[in-house]
């Protein structure tokens, strides 16, 4: 959703201005993303904290002048706030970016028009590179006739997902670990 908690600090997207904020215990909310200004408005959701790299990773919608909308998975540096570094783009929609427990891999769901997320989505994974970007992307599951939902990493690095590939929603596991 639009809120996550890491070591007592709350990270949330504020409805009134759609900015991403950090609220430390006993503190006041601090904005991590820019205020709307030049006509581009950013909206943030579905994120989590990458503690090793001091950043929040989640979905960003950029609403630009002329009605254009660009969706991406971004990383927002919590020490040097800004609109976020794009990690993944190129699809119409993104959801559920999930960092592996060891912080070495990122999984996410994407899909394109005319599909809706319950019709056809794809699950992707990539290693996180030394510079914090993503390495080679691998499609793990999904397509135009398969919907993937709720990717989740187990503590030992196994990726679980829900798929309707056989006409019914079922749980699947994928071993995508790297050496």
For every predicted segment, state its role:
Residues 24-27, 77-81, 128-132, 175-178:
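Short loop/turn segments that connect beta-strands within beta-propeller blades
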Residues 9, 54-56, 105, 158-159:
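Conserved core beta-strand positions within WD40 beta-propeller blades
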Residues 9-32, 44-50, 56:
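Hydrophobic or amphipathic alpha-helical targeting/insertion segments
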Residues 32, 79-89, 132-143, 179:
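Blade-edge beta-strand/turn elements of extracellular beta-propeller
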Residues 5-7, 49-52, 101-102, 154-156:
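Residue-level detector of Asp-centered blade-edge/turn motifs that repeat once per structural unit
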Residues 1, 12-21, 36-43, 59-73, ...:
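A flexible loop/linker signature enriched in serine peptidases of the S9 family
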